[in-house]
């Protein structure tokens, strides 16, 4: 994926963290066409991020995926050949935590998008439910996206790729990156070789069938040994998400 370019006063932060806003899944295989009905393809002059449909009118992605104009594809599999039920939507409203530190991209990296028109369930479109419980360390988790399938040179696939990774104790990411933002999950494969990558940002981390994370950051090159990616922890933001959807547009994210 194309890496997000951060303004000059964030260059020091980039030495410690590498943003994966346009990354693909490394070490995965083509997703089954029926396993990603909730997966959104975010386009702004080119594919740059993923997202997750959580009901007929709302998509969750990463805050760093926000752009002025976004086209959202749902029901897509092969980029060059649209499905019959593929839909295009635009944001009607976008919500980012009002207490997010604007100069720290990793802080509260979550964005809720209200679509300009609801979508209907179809053969290739259906929402993914929000988690009912937090994930457990050791869980097997599914990653997916149209991000780069090679690293460091990037190769963008025509179809989404999927792979399985493991959920780690957050100390693994703290040791790898000299820190870890709050309300974050750490996931990957310790020996390397499987990972999200450029273009996968904003896409889901699905652990034991539940939508638990939103891809935020990871190492560059992707898929290095002992360099897991980290994901915004969806469960910790449930009160904010549910309040916004219920109409409380001034809801504040947890500290």
UniProtKB/Swiss-Prot annotation:
Subcellular location(s) of the protein: Secreted
Predominant subcellular localization, coarse grouping: secreted
Tissues expressing the protein: Expressed by the venom gland.
Signal peptide interval: 1-18
Record propeptide residues: 19-24
Residue positions the entry lists as glycosylated: 169, 248
Keywords assigned by UniProt, alphabetized: Disulfide bond, Glycoprotein, Hemostasis impairing toxin, Hydrolase, Protease, Secreted, Serine protease, Signal, Toxin, Zymogen
Catalytic residues identified in the record: 64 (charge relay system), 109 (charge relay system), 201 (charge relay system)
Disulfide cysteine pairs (residue numbers): 31-162, 49-65, 97-253, 141-207, 173-186, 197-222
GO BP terms: proteolysis
InterPro entries tied to this protein: Peptidase_S1_PA, Peptidase_S1_PA_chymotrypsin, Peptidase_S1A, Trypsin_dom, TRYPSIN_HIS, TRYPSIN_SER
Keyword Disulfide bond tagged: yes
Residue ranges annotated for the Peptidase S1 domain, each copy included: 25-246
EC nos: 3.4.21.-
A Pfam family of this chain: Trypsin
GO molecular function annotations of the record: serine-type endopeptidase activity; toxin activity
Coiled-coil region(s): none
Any one of the GO CC terms: extracellular region
Annotated family: Belongs to the peptidase S1 family. Snake venom subfamily.
Protein role: Snake venom serine protease that may act in the hemostasis system of the prey.
PANTHER family: KALLIKREIN-1, KALLIKREIN-RELATED
Quaternary data: Monomer.
Annotated protein name in UniProt: Snake venom serine protease HS112
Species whose genome carries this gene: Bothrops jararaca
């Amino acid at each position: 994926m194309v890496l997000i370019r951060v303004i000059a006063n964030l260059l020091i932060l980039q030495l410690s963290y590498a943003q994966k806003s346009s990354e693909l899944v490394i070490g995965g295989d083509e997703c089954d066409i029926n396993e990603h009905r909730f997966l959104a393809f975010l386009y702004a002059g080119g594919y740059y991020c993923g997202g997750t449909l959580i009901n007929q009118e709302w998509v969750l992605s990463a805050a760093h995926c926000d752009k002025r104009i976004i086209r959202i594809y749902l029901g897509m599999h092969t980029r060059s050949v649209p499905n019959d039920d593929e839909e295009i939507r635009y944001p009607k409203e976008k919500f980012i935590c009002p207490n997010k530190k604007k100069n720290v991209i990793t802080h509260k990296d979550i964005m809720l998008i209200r679509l300009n028109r609801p979508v209907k369930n179809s053969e290739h479109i259906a929402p993914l439910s929000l988690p009912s419980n937090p994930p457990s360390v050791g869980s097997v988790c599914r990653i997916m996206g149209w991000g780069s399938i090679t690293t460091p040179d990037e190769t963008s696939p025509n179809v989404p790729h999927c792979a399985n990774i493991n959920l780690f104790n957050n100390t693994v990411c703290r040791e790898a990156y000299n820190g870890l933002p709050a309300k974050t999950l750490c996931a990957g494969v310790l020996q390397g070789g499987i990972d999200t990558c450029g273009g996968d940002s904003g896409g889901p981390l699905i652990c034991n069938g539940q939508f638990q994370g939103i891809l935020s950051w990871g190492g560059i090159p992707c898929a290095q040994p002992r360099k897991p990616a980290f994901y915004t922890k969806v469960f910790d933001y449930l009160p904010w998400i549910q309040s916004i959807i219920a109409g409380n547009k001034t809801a504040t994210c947890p500290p």
